[in-house]
Amino acid sequence: MSMNLHGSAGLAMAELSAVGQRARRRVAYRLLPFVFLLYIVNYLDRVNVSFANLRMSADLGFSDRVYGLGVGMFYITYVLFEIPGAVIVERWSARKWIARIMISWGIVTILTGFVHTATQFYAARFFLGAAESSFFPGMIVYLTHWFCARDRSRAIACLYAANPAAALIGSPLAGWLLGVHWLSLTGWRWLFILEGIPAVVVGTITYFYMTDRPVQASWLPHDERDWLVKELQDELKAKNKLRNPTILEAFRDARILRLILAYFLALTGALGTIYWIPTFVKRLSGVSNQTVTLLLLVPALIGLAGMLINGWHSDKTAERRLHTAIPLLAAGSMFALLTLGRHNMPLAIVSLLLGSGFLYAYYPTFWAIPTMMLSEAAAAATFGLINSIGQLGGLAGNYTIGYLNDRTHSLTASFAFIALVYVVAGNLILSLRIRDPIGVLPRSN
């Protein structure tokens, strides 16, 4: 009798495990390719200005400081509206809000193709930030609605892998468009116009394709849907035994402050690199715009491989700290080498491309840290808090690089600045004790 009971229990557990495997696989196949597509469109629209700048600043008479400030203007409104938008995703509808985001940013991107003055450029970037705000934290929150903790890092890695994948598409496309001249419009203008249209189209599709939560998923079989809902509810109950911190409590916790500062510095370097790397390669090498865009396939490939391998290995070993810090330190070392070997053109180009590729690998493992330690209700606002302060690095980094370029008439100071922020960010992550709950306190009696 006892053996039969144990055997029946074991069989039931095996069947339940099989249902769980099917549910996890079906969700991944349904959601991740579409999320990947959304982020490719997002990344293309966000960084096409870096390729456009190979011609735009010269055509419009912009200095490096004007370009850097214009790029940074995006992050002012992005930060202002990010937290409210992320909370809307949590409390209202990811499907409707993300569709709205994509359609509006596509329209603003198209209009950017018609700017003529610095003021118009600033305004276009300012409104693009407002349109796009909350897309990233909203997508992170959306993934927490569908993926269990053990799968989340790989899901986020898939999201971030769209960045270098988009560069693989965007670099040669930009190289071709920069050489066209249609309807009295130069190529950099067509770059904005033609890359804004897909956002409007895909945003419309998003409204009909996405499902907000598993309980609403008619495409999941009943047993798989029930398993996934229960699994996520069990995780939620465990997390909700911890009290969510207030904003003031978060700022009093040294670990949270360290995490916020590390992300701010990492994005100061990363966003500075992303928006300036075509200009850096052009000025270091003197090659054509088309060759620049082809060279930029190298960091995209390195970044794609590094991000997926790092995210996979981080999940396999259940280790986050080193998997986040090492890519930052590696990128910093490459930019430090640039300050020493800038006049050796082959060494400089290799260091620049490697450093730009390494920076992608830390993203998914960084975001796996807070997602494992926060309750779902607090996740939207907390992601927004960390990401909002971090995104200010986009303003700080791009304006500082433009200022240093204009002030010194050299790239050396900018390379040193980027190296410094990467190294400090990496060391802050190394100093972080992530085995203890971050930003949460035991529930009081």
Q: Where does each model-flagged region fall?
A:
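Interfacial helix-cap and linker-helix signal at transmembrane-aqueous boundaries
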Residues: 56-57, 88-89, 173-183, 281-282, ...
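Conserved MFS/SLC helix-loop-helix module at the cytosolic interface between two early adjacent transmembrane helices
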Residues: 80-119
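Extracytoplasmic gate region of multi-pass secondary transporters
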Residues: 49-50, 248-310, 363, 367, ...
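Helix-to-loop junctions at the C-terminal end of transmembrane segments
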Residues: 81-94, 306-319, 405-406
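Glycine-rich segments within core transmembrane alpha-helices of 12-TM secondary carriers
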Residues: 154-175, 198-199, 387-397
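Cytoplasmic helix-loop-helix junction between adjacent transmembrane helices
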Residues: 124-161
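Helix-breaking motifs and short loop linkers at transmembrane-helix boundaries and internal kinks
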Residues: 61, 93, 114-120, 131, ...
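C-terminal transmembrane helical hairpin of 12-TM major facilitator-type secondary transporters
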Residues: 320-369
